[in-house]
Amino acid sequence: MLTGKEIREKYLRFFEQRGHQILPSASLIPHNDPSILWTAAGMVPFKPFFTGQAVPEYQRVTTCQKCIRTPDIESVGRTARHHTFFEMLGNFSFGDYFKESIIPWAWEFITKELNLPKEKLWITIYQDDDEAFEIWNKVVGIPSERIVRLGKDTNFWEIGVGPCGPCSEIYVDLGEARGCGSPECQVGCDCDRFLEIWNLVFIQFFRDEEGNYSPLENKGIDTGMGLERVASVLQGVASNFDTDIFREIMDFTANLAGQEYGQKADIDLALKVIADHCRAVTFAVSDGALPGNEGRGYVIRRLLRRAVRFGRVLGVREPFLYKVAQAVIKQMQDAYPELKQKAEHVLRVIRTEEERFLETLAAGSDILSALINEAKASGASEITGDDAFKLYDTFGFPLELTQEIAEEQGLAVDVEVFNAAMEEQRKRARSARQETEYLSERGVLYKALREELGETRFIGYSALEADSNIMALLKDGMQEISAVAGEEVEIVLDVTPCYAESGGQVADHAILRGPDLEVEITSVNKPVEGLVIHRGKVLSGIIKRHDSVKAIVDQPRRQDTARNHSATHLLHKALKEVLGDHVNQAGSLVEPDRLRFDFTHYAAVTSEELRRIEEIVNEAVLSNLSIEVFETSLSKAKEMGAAALFGEKYGKQVRVVKMGDFSMELCGGTHLTSTAEVGLFKIFNETSVGAGLRRIEAVTGTGVLKYLKAKEEQLEEIASVIKSPMHELVRRSEALVQQNKSLEQEIEALRNKLAKSEVQDILGNIKRAKEVPVLASVVAAPDMDNLRGMVDMLRDKMGSGVILLGSTAGEKVNLVAAVTKDLHGQGLHAGNLVKEIAKMVGGGGGGRPDMAQAGGKNPEKLQEAIDQVCRVVEGQIK
């Protein structure tokens, strides 16, 4: 029996012997292809070669490609074949061999290398592919009755925009016992009898965004054999999950949870889902993906959270997925060395995300359980969309998870109302942004101006001044002939040296100067591609449409901005060196006085890491690296290794910014000519801006001197306040902290003493409600912790009874209630009691039957509310 590892090796060696270069798997994150989230097939990394956009180094290639597909996440574990992560064995020809070679090779491999019985093999071809039929029938010798012609839905391969073509599939007949029993059952039937193990795609066409097909200049071959699927056939098991590829991970998980595979259906399902999802997450994170709320980050988060949920089915309540990930790494690291290299990072990301979700799960699950119980008690058949949205919006509880848990309890979720609530939230967000967005009418005007005037010519990379003509003049969104001093205007020039805000870099400031007129420009942007709008104020004279002016950029401001932009590139590279290759730019702001850089990372950057990042940037600055800026083709830039932003749309020609051998990125911003011009680099803030996202803020050049001067002044002020010389600040501060700690301990001891005294005093105020001891009082407790402590002391002394204490803190009311366990059977519930009393002081709250707390905002009504406690208790006693 061949193992998964042996099948992988046998396949690659077979094609290596036939002139193919073995290449390592490409990343799961597609390189410079924003049209897809994941590498979902073996040919994805080779699309440019099939389309002619790039020239391959090798004409024949074979790979075992890591793949992720997520359309059917819910089916994972419930069927024999569905996976989110899988390995695709493939061989490729870029304008070299075609059908005449791959078809005989495929037959040779499966019948001689894998020793599959010929009588169990069937072939499908595209209905119009007579060429493939002839090769299978005449050259290979497959009887015509075992070659099945099928339509485009099954035998024409395409994944949206890109290379495509007819395909031929090889099927294995697994026997009548696996079939549907129909006498008409044959290849193409939806049952499990005929299993497709290899797809041979004949790349002949390119499909565009409109769905049109055009012949490719270079025909090619793309084949795909699912490793997990063929392993199930060769190992004689009914499910991919029963192959050695999965069983090793599933057995590890079962042992971890104290469970056994093959005994209970729900346990088996959980083990399968966890194994699948953990494989996907482990590989994705090793390739640079991080959990998040959008795009591939959302996919990773969803898979992790589903796996955690299924861990609870196994009885696991603590973080465990990182341990399963260790098993995945151990099993797969020989074939994929990057797993071992990134192991520490992968395990840390998974554990951090799992711990965060367990906190979310604890809070959300309790509320969802209550909602489910309420729905069942009222005879409802679903959880309301509003409740599902509240769980999502308040606790981060995913809709999919709410649906799964509700479904287990026989309930649905009103997704329509949930979606409506989501859309309403989006509308509110859009409304909040309207003040900074252009009105739709103005957008129409800009588009018309672009069509009428053509493109604004930008010369600002090489010049800071330009003789220009005013092509259009706008005031308040309307075209005007002229404007006078004091008026705010928008101006379109035929040529401009002004950089328009884009790519995170702020716009230039400038002066437009003409005979007897001057306009101050404080904003430049491109509301429509190709049209540059200059916004500013007329300082003197009268400006008219068609006037000739000289546009003069504020050179010091431009230089300061360029200094920070170049430093941003150095920072990006330094972050990757210190934190790892998973770091990617997620946003930036480049201004004259500072820079802000958002990036993907799973944890706060430590002080030591920040120091090292600063050192690396300043070393690059002091190295006086030459900064080269040049234009080239996108394909050439990729070959050179220039970094690009995922999701950014690039044209065929791109602008590359290269800083010695240290950094190379695609960038349209303005830059220095040497890194030495950065002067100095200093990070002044690092913080979180979302799950898996961090932000660094920094200054450069004279900004560093200003920053250090401000810090020095702060230290001088602190020294003055605590009456200490500068050189003794640390020692004096430590002494003050210790003194403060001692005083706090003394205060706490006094508070406890006072609390005990007050507790003793109010014990004489016990009343009875239907023979139940009730103690209710207003006390002097500075905060909720002290109030709870007093309630605990009273409960210990009373032994049996109901206690409710209230205190004020400024304009707030604090309430704590307790009910001893012997009274729970009489209908008394601390949460219900405190909730009722809290209403009387304008607040709310609740909690457990034995202890609960609440707050209010009407301290003047506290005594009145306390006086009602006995009455409320009487009403609750059964």
Curated annotation (Swiss-Prot):
GO biological process per UniProt: alanyl-tRNA aminoacylation
E.C. number(s) listed in UniProt: 6.1.1.7
Disulfide pattern: none
Sorted UniProt keywords: Aminoacyl-tRNA synthetase, ATP-binding, Cytoplasm, Ligase, Metal-binding, Nucleotide-binding, Protein biosynthesis, RNA-binding, tRNA-binding, Zinc
GO cellular component, one term: cytosol
Subcellular localization: Cytoplasm
Predominant subcellular localization, coarse grouping: cytoplasm
Listed InterPro entries: aa-tRNA-synth_II/BPL/LPL (IPR045864), Ala-tRNA-lgiase_IIc (IPR002318), Ala-tRNA-ligase_IIc_anticod-bd (IPR018162), Ala-tRNA-synth_IIc_core (IPR018165), Ala-tRNA-synth_IIc_N (IPR018164), Ala-tRNA_ligase (IPR050058), Ala_tRNA_ligase_euk/bac (IPR023033), DHHA1_dom (IPR003156)
CDD domains tied to this protein: AlaRS_core
Cofactor: Zn(2+)
Gene3D superfamilies per record: 2.40.30.130, 3.10.310.40, 3.30.54.20, 6.10.250.550, Bira Bifunctional Protein, Domain 2, Threonyl-trna Synthetase, Chain A, domain 2
Cofactor note: Binds 1 zinc ion per subunit.
GO MF term set: alanine-tRNA ligase activity; aminoacyl-tRNA deacylase activity; ATP binding; catalytic activity, acting on a protein; transferase activity; tRNA binding; zinc ion binding
Catalyzed reactions per annotation: tRNA(Ala) + L-alanine + ATP = L-alanyl-tRNA(Ala) + AMP + diphosphate
Binding positions (Zn(2+)): 565, 569, 667, 671
Database matches in Pfam families: DHHA1 (PF02272), tRNA-synt_2c (PF01411), tRNA_SAD (PF07973)
Enzyme class: ligase
HAMAP family: Ala_tRNA_synth_B
Function summary: Catalyzes the attachment of alanine to tRNA(Ala) in a two-step reaction: alanine is first activated by ATP to form Ala-AMP and then transferred to the acceptor end of tRNA(Ala). Also edits incorrectly charged Ser-tRNA(Ala) and Gly-tRNA(Ala) via its editing domain.
Family per similarity comment: Belongs to the class-II aminoacyl-tRNA synthetase family.
Recorded domain comment: Consists of three domains; the N-terminal catalytic domain, the editing domain and the C-terminal C-Ala domain. The editing domain removes incorrectly charged amino acids, while the C-Ala domain, along with tRNA(Ala), serves as a bridge to cooperatively bring together the editing and aminoacylation centers thus stimulating deacylation of misacylated tRNAs.
Name this polypeptide is given: Alanine--tRNA ligase
